[in-house]
Amino acid sequence: MPIVSRKIRQLNAKAVTVSGLAAGAAFVAVLETDLRLTGRNVDDLMILGRPFTEDPSKARAVGMAIHVVNSLALASLYARLEGRLPGPGWVKGAIFANVENVILYPITRFEDVHPAIRTGQVDRYFNWPAFRQSVPRHIAFGAVLGVLYDRLRLG
């Protein structure tokens, strides 16, 4: 019996790259804003980079590099899944990014092994205030990703 193959939709590399980078920038803009407004030091760039270096300024730079790679990877995944999500691009993107957040957030339960949390360089993540702080970041990421991806892949 033959195996039924699905035609895998060709990704538009420009749409994925531009929308992913712009979405990542939106995430960081909201992150920087909420760090200042809330007074809660829930810094994802430090969390990503600190395991690789002890210097806080270098940790944020390394974290930014990792964030860029993550943004591009998520944009690629979004491009594969967006046709299955309801609504206009910004809604699809916001749903996608917040589902990713909900799926991965339980990892923060193991925060005690993270060097930046152990040394007090960032606040604890495994709590409701920190989770709530992550939601606008993911809404911004997803909305920008969805809108730009739709516009760029179609035009």
PLM feature segments, named:
Residues 1-155:
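Short amphipathic, positively biased membrane-proximal segments
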